[in-house]
Amino acid sequence: MDPESEGPAVITVTPLQQMFASCTGAILTSLMVTPFDVVKIRLQAQNNPFPKGKCFLYSNGLMDHLCVCEEEGNKAWYKKPGHFQGTLDAFLKIIRNEGIKSLWSGLPPTLVMAVPATVIYFTCYDQLTALLRSKLGENESRIPIVAGIVARLGAVTVISPLELIRTKMQSKKFSYEELHRFVSKKVSEDGWISLWRGWAPTILRDVPFSAMYWYNYEVLKKWLCAKSGLYEPTFMINFTSGALSGSFAAVVTLPFDVVKTQKQTQLWIYESQKISMPLQMSTWTIMKNIVAKNGFSGLFTGLIPRLIKIAPACAVMISTYEFGKSFFQKQNAQRQRY
């Protein structure tokens, strides 16, 4: 067989370069997606003001964060009065009255968790994919599923205790000494496993999402390349594949997202009010209760807002990440020539 027909030789990218590419993608994604969630939260707070101690979910496009209302007045960014008539009106009034930076309110503290989680996730996925392909062959279709599951498990396991600490620090201003005492007391009373109390509901949604996302992304990318007669995907092929695969995974896993949100919120109520945790209901039981109360459609509450958030986030993240890797591949290829 003519070696030319097999496409160009693949130039490897180092783990450090993968980390840099994923970090860049994570920051760009959060900068582009966060304004939509900020506006959504401001509209929610306008219609149903958040009381002190109330928690709400804040998304920067990379991961969801449980945030707790701290102050009674209008000092917090999500409590500022706006008199918005809708989404577009909220965008315009926030920019005009508060400055464009207000569209990224609350972002910096969440990036401390979201960027490392994304870097771990994407770098582990690529490293695992390369390892599995070297063992099982390039065309093994199960590789993206396995690599996606393991990478997501690893990222959530590393970040989950840190996110618990971040939420606690945000709900009450702790010094580092007080935080150390809080963690020590929690571990002595409930064991080390208590630091991963939010792990299960997150895994419930993120692992199936990751498996479906990476499998469909790789399949779509290959199909679009074949249709275009290309060996390597373009920026738009990566962008389109990311948006479509992310949208599909978002729809299928939405019931788990609804359950995750409910479990996270209940967990925070018990933690913050020092109420002893009752025997937790299983995911299946919570789903049955939702269906009994709101019908089958209750499992798909928030579908449109989730798609509006997930599709562009997945598209921007993966296309930026692949662009970064492509840039480093060219740099590495040039070094090999000289």
From Swiss-Prot:
Stated name of the protein: Mitochondrial glutathione transporter SLC25A40
Q: What is its main location?
A: mitochondrion
The reactions it catalyses are:
glutathione(in) = glutathione(out)
Its biological purpose = Probable mitochondrial transporter required for glutathione import into mitochondria. Glutathione, which plays key roles in oxidative metabolism, is produced exclusively in the cytosol and is imported in many organelles. Mitochondrial glutathione is required for the activity and stability of proteins containing iron-sulfur clusters, as well as erythropoiesis.
Extract one GO BP annotation from the record: import into the mitochondrion
Q: Which residues form the signal peptide?
A: none
Q: Does the keyword Ribosomal protein apply?
A: no
Which GO-annotated molecular functions does the record name?
glutathione transmembrane transporter activity
Q: Which Pfam families match?
A: Mito_carr
Where found?
A: Mitochondrion inner membrane
Q: Give an example GO cellular component term for this record.
A: mitochondrion
Which family is this sequence assigned to?
Belongs to the mitochondrial carrier (TC 2.A.29) family.
Topological category with respect to the lipid bilayer: Multi-pass membrane protein
* Keyword Glycoprotein included in the entry's annotation: no
